[in-house]
């Protein structure tokens, strides 16, 4: 696995097109301005401090950033995210909720944590000479994912989902994403 191609951190839209042959999940932190987009046939608007997590970027339409829009984006391949996702059934609840509403309005404290996660990932990606490169990159992404879970649980509440239900929901979500329904 070439980890430098599995995860990319950039600061502008359009570098990885939504119709790219290579699928990437997008984690976008809005740093300034606004950005409107249509996802899953619903309209959303990002403001400074908002985090948007999109699992299926091909469902994005009509992206309209303001002239002063600034952001940081983590693009990660699904296989890399699967590798880094902690063994928690919360991931399924979050995935389903993000499919319905991919925007989280972060508190100022959460924004600091999120920005720190993005910065750490960017530094880890660049540090290819680290003797434990793979492990540090996976660890940094896993920490970011746990923070994303925490943001989501604090904003929308936490509920228990059994392992069996999480597995069924995961398969159902993959069918929806693939258009086989």
What residue spans do the PLM features occupy?
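Generic protein-terminus/edge-of-domain signal
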Residues: 1-52, 57
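Short histidine-centered beta-strand/loop micro-motifs
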Residues: 15-22, 62-65, 160-161
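Amphipathic, well-ordered alpha-helical segments in soluble domains
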Residues: 26, 113-120, 140, 144-147
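Short beta-strand His + acidic residue motifs that chelate non-heme Fe in jelly-roll/DSBH
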Residues: 36-38, 60-67
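Histidine-centered metal-chelating micro-motifs
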Residues: 52, 56-62, 81-82
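A hydrophobic/aromatic-rich effector-binding and dimerization subdomain
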Residues: 65-127
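Short, charged, low-hydrophobicity "junction" segments
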Residues: 89-97, 142-153
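Short, Lys/Arg-enriched, Trp-marked, Pro/Gly-tolerant hinge/linker segments that flank
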Residues: 106, 128-136, 148-181
């Amino acid at each position: 696995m070439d980890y430098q191609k599995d995860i990319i951190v950039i600061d502008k839209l359009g570098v990885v097109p939504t119709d790219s042959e290579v699928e990437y999940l997008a984690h976008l932190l809005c740093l300034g301005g606004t950005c409107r987009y249509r996802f899953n046939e619903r309209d959303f608007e990002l403001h400074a401090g908002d985090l948007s997590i999109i699992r299926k970027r091909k469902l994005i339409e009509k992206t309209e950033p303001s002239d002063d829009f600034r952001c940081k984006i983590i693009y990660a391949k699904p296989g890399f995210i699967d590798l880094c996702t902690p063994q928690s059934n919360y991931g399924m609840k979050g995935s389903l909720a993000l499919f319905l509403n991919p925007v989280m309005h972060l508190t100022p404290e959460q924004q600091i944590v999120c920005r720190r996660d993005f910065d750490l990932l960017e530094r880890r990606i660049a540090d290819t000479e680290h003797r434990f490169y793979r492990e540090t990159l996976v660890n940094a992404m896993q920490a970011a994912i746990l923070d994303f879970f925490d943001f989501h649980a604090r904003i929308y509440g936490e509920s228990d989902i059994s392992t069996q239900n999480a597995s069924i929901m995961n398969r159902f979500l993959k069918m929806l994403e693939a258009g086989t329904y």
